[in-house]
Amino acid sequence: MPSRYLVTAALPYSNNRLHVGHIAGAYLPADTYVRYLRAAGHEVRFICGSDDNGVAIEISALQEQSTPEQIASHYHERQAQDFAGLEIEFDVYGGTHHPDYVALHEHFSQDFFTRIHAGGYFTKRRTQQLYDAQAGRFLPDRFVRGICHHCGFERATGDQCEACGQMIEPLLLKNPLSVITGQPAEVRETTHWYLRLSDFEKPLRQWLESKQGQWRANVLNFALGQIKQGLPERSMTRDIAWGVPVPLDDPDARGKVLYVWFDAPIGYMSFTAAWCARHAGDWQDYQKWWCAPDCAIIHFIGEDNTVFHALTWPAMLMAHGRPQLPTAVVANNFMNHKVAGELQKISKSTTAADAPVWVEEYLKRGLDPDALRYYLTAQAPEAARTAFDPEDFVTRNNSELVAALGNFVNRALTFAARYFEGRVPDPAAQTDADRAHLAQADEALRKVGACLAEHRFRNGLEELMAYARVCNEYFSVRAPWSSRKDDLADCAATIATCIHAIEYLAIMCWPFMPGAARKLQRMLGRPAEMIQWAAPRPPKCGTPLGEPTILFAKLEPGALG
């Protein structure tokens, strides 16, 4: 069992707002996992930050008639606010070009490149690259679009096809067009440094095969399939101005920067070092998290990042030789948007700016962050692509959160407030039925915990809601409104059992819906942040309870537009 956990969530490009697909893909499951680990008593660091370098930022700067610095800073702050609004709480939210983090990040990135270069894993090669003669510049990565040479998708970029997820060889793109001018790209010569991924095929295969039965099949099948096809060389330098300068004393390296997918995952490490500098006084304490066999390193990503986190990044770590390989790479699929019954990809160019799929817009409407966290977990694209359906969101909020979980809590606590002076009644007359119900609570807590530990968040939430429905059934069968009239001791035992059950629910809610968990704690008269993943002790008779409040608000049809 690891003594520590280092959990990362994929760095979002700081060139756009966050949408529900981003949240469901990497950030919400990571936050859910971290909350569970901490409640279970583990030492955890949760690392994320904005990906400020590379082509995506340059393109946005051109489109918005701004500078890369301004784009990165602007969206970094907006994304940080979105995360805070959903209570996705990182220990550090850095930025690869943020003033507070850029120096350490460049140090780590350039040191990585230098070590890999010294190890002889790069091939320096004069090569042909796509070029925009009108703009007078080369067209790396997203600066060019064309038809994917793997699957035929018509808007593949020069580094990866978002339809099939495979890496792209830019010169094999059909009908390549410059994103800058729209003109057909031509071919010119330049020099770049290529990481020979083929050198790592055998150790990567062995490492991945050792994860069988531990990792999700979608990650393993994709990565092992890529190795079976043969891993290509990948250029780790680019002909652009915005990024980490290539740290070589070589005339051919002048004016070049590191490929964004070389330096981006290093951000996990540099941000950890920044946290250590701030909280432990020494940035080199990052080794406690990255170079120690007793620390588990868990990466949460979207499906389009699988190739980088399951192949390229581990190969870089192997070439470097020091840091630990990831313990797990947890990848989710894409989440689309259902509009008028039709599935649409969420996109800055095609999705309405005020659509509630943008986190910023959802929060502006004053809607419950926990309701969104619930729905995105219930619809989590863990094994296949799913969709955010505003109508289904309202239906599930009302029929599940309100009618099941919220209803039981309200029934039990308002009964205690009305008939037992807002205190825990005497459980002395508990029956076998009451004890059996609490045994179900123990089992539910165990099942939810097992699901969370295994990154099966959707199943964990299903177990929580299954127990909430059991609680409603228990309340109805025990009928305290009836026993109050002829057997007050039995009525008291029923309500005491319900209060104990709500304590279980508060614990199980914490990773998924922290706001709801705090509300439950307050209604139970407990400190709002004292959550431990362990069976709660029976509440003491006479303990004062808090005031019952509505746990979840009912939504009207069309509440999300």
Task: Go through the PLM ranges and name each one.
Residues M1-R4, R45, R125-L130, Q134, ...:
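Basic, alpha-helical terminal appendages of large translation-related enzymes
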Residues P2-G41, R45-C48, H98-D100, L104-H107, ...:
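Structured secondary-structure scaffolds
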Residues T32, Q70-Q81, D111, A404-R411, ...:
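A non-catalytic, amphipathic alpha-helix used as a structural packing/dimerization or gating element
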Residues I47, E69, G255, Y259, ...:
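Amphipathic, non-membrane alpha-helical segments in soluble helical-bundle scaffolds
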Residues S60-S73:
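A charged helix-plus-loop insertion that forms the helical arch/lid used to bind
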Residues R78-R155:
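A broadly conserved sequence feature marking short terminus-proximal activation segments
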Residues L139, R155-A156, I168, A185:
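Cys/His-rich microdomains that often coordinate metals
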Residues T306, L376-Q379, A383, D389-D392, ...:
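Active-site-proximal binding-pocket segments
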